[in-house]
Regions:
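ALDH superfamily catalytic-core signature
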Residues: 1-149, 171-173, 178-182, 216, ...
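C-terminal core of ALDH-fold dehydrogenases
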Residues: 4, 130-144, 173-261
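Short loop/turn motifs at secondary-structure junctions
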Residues: 18, 61, 158, 186-187, ...
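Short, solvent-exposed loop/beta-turn-alpha elements that line the ligand-binding surface or hinge
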Residues: 154
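Short, surface-exposed loop/turn microsegments at beta-strand edges and helix-strand junctions
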Residues: 157-158, 229
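Glycine-rich nucleotide-phosphate-binding loops and adjacent flexible coil segments
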Residues: 161
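Active-site donor-binding acidic/aromatic loop of nucleotide-activated sugar
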Residues: 164-166
Length: 275
């Protein structure tokens, strides 16, 4: 839709007195990538909170994760333990961590991804996958593990409680970072988990353009309005950082005014008469 709007505006430039400005924040395929030095407990909590808060119906929700082979067994164990405790139900009851997805259209779309995943080799349901629309539109918090890092649910925004995990060889840190950077057209949010400072710096460099809001050792969602300017680039929008002066400037046309108090009275510059 945003591309269509921009195309329509661009094709109508002759109607405007100046080049119109457009600000957009569209969506994301937000990532968590963990180094072999990551804190397992912090990582598992971030994956659960980041993927399943608000049923994953946030443009910043974690929806793809890259976990090293040395950590995955422990991370999976901790996530499964937490998911076993999670309650779903009426969101007015604060004992419930999750509620229903927003409507039948969303329910059917998310269910479609899960139904397709069941038919694909190399895709494993680690947790969840059940859908129930008998009363409301409820989808279990789901973890998919995929062998193919370019599988559909690693690339496309689902906007639901589905987290897809690719387990990589723990010696291939930089190669995996390049994979993260090139897999999705979006660049909204992302998180890196590493206690190794050198690994963090490598990630900062490789993922320079992969996320407009970039988190280190924290979940990639939950930017506080008025405290953390928010926005992303690539297919995620114009990265004008809502909640900051950068966004405000996009809505105004700056003008510089110069007033000369002592104007020159001779066209010749001083250097023109120099010997």
């Amino acid at each position: 839709m945003f591309r269509s709007l921009w195309h329509t505006i661009g094709s109508s430039l002759d109607r405007y007195r100046t080049y119109p400005r457009i600000v957009g924040e569209t969506g994301g395929k937000d990532f968590i990538v963990a180094h072999r030095s990551a804190d397992v407990e912090a990582l598992a909590v971030a994956m659960v909170r980041g993927a399943y808060e608000y049923q994953g119906q946030k443009c910043s929700a974690a929806s793809r994760a890259y976990i090293p082979s040395n950590l995955w067994p422990r991370v999976k164990e901790r996530m499964l333990a937490m998911l076993a405790e999670i309650k779903m139900g009426d969101v007015s009851d604060f004992r419930n961590f999750m509620g229903a997805v927003i409507d039948k259209k969303a329910f059917d779309r998310i269910k479609g991804y899960l139904d397709e995943a069941r038919t694909k080799p190399g895709v494993t349901f680690v947790a969840g996958g059940k859908c129930d629309d008998s009363k409301g539109w409820f989808i279990e918090p789901t973890i998919l593990q995929v062998e193919d890092p370019k599988y559909r649910t690693m690339c496309e925004e689902i906007f639901g409680p589905v987290l897809t995990v690719h387990v990589y060889a723990d010696t291939k840190w930089e190669e995996t970072l390049h994979l993260v950077d090139t897999t999705s057209p979006y660049a909204l949010t992302g998180a890196v988990f590493a206690q190794d400072r050198s690994a963090q710096e490598t990630a900062n460099r490789v993922l320079r353009n992969a996320a407009g809001n970039y988190y280190i050792n924290d979940k990639p969602t939950g930017a506080v309005v008025g405290q953390q300017p928010f926005g992303g680039a690539r297919a995620s929008g114009t990265n004008d950082k809502a909640g900051s002066i950068l966004n405000l400037i996009r809505w105004v046309s700056p003008r510089l005014v110069k007033e000369t108090m002592v104007p020159p009275k001779d066209y010749k510059y001083p250097f023109l008469g120099a010997e």
